């Protein structure tokens, strides 16, 4: 197995483990504390990486005072969107499952294209095929079947509430991607990630102090806190750094295909680590979502 294939395999496996980790932390930590610790630790790691590997980018920004205010405004807005996105996403995971998070993550891809198509001509060209709409419809139907069957099995509305949180998160993420696309024309994506994660972590920390939730951390063992910090490192390295590497070295086509494999990896790891089980209808609906997204992304893949 060559190096590129090794990277692909490790990415799918590590991302498959990432959702159970987030689900586990969402159960044991209040959302504001969870996100503030994870984002501040992960953001700090990315800042260190930027200082070591991307000093030229930082010098370029400092050397152009005119764009500093421009970037600060957009990065701050991006941090706000990231804060909202992860608030709803973590709450969604708390009430659903790791697999549900990965399924809804797939739905974000075609939704992002639709929203981007409103503002960018190159994205608008991608939604002119009927296959896109057929695929999007299949994905939505599949996700609804998944949610309905899950909430019926639980016998309460918690799963349905979690699904609403996840839908809200992927909508915010789609709008957030528009800002990323605009800012990425000015600075490297890794620098964007470092800035966004740090700003989002600070915002979550302020909210945690304001709501007094931060004091709940006093009752948490040092082992769990270290685990949460490590989860922040893990999320940044797999969800951002490895993703950037694959997009840069292997292309968006390969990246999108790998994204479609993550729910399978998540289902297996979620079963082994969290004892999460799915019924036959949820399994079929998950496959429908994946097929729908493959159709919706088909033209995009050809163009990349």
Swiss-Prot record:
Family recorded in the similarity comment: Belongs to the EamA transporter family.
GO cellular component: plasma membrane
Domain EamA: 13-148, 171-298
Cross-referenced PANTHER family: INNER MEMBRANE TRANSPORTER, S-ADENOSYLMETHIONINE_S-ADENOSYLHOMOCYSTEINE TRANSPORTER
Organism: Haemophilus influenzae (strain ATCC 51907 / DSM 11121 / KW20 / Rd)
Record's bilayer topology term: Multi-pass membrane protein
Residues annotated as transmembrane: 9-29, 67-87, 100-120, 131-151, 159-179, 189-209, 222-242, 252-272, 278-298
Keywords attached to this entry: Cell membrane, Membrane, Repeat, Transmembrane, Transmembrane helix, Transport
Top-level lineage group: Bacteria
Name the UniProt record assigns to this protein: Uncharacterized transporter HI_0687
Location relative to the cell: Cell membrane
Keyword Transmembrane helix: yes
InterPro entries: AA-Vitamin_Transporters, EamA_dom
Major location (coarse): membrane
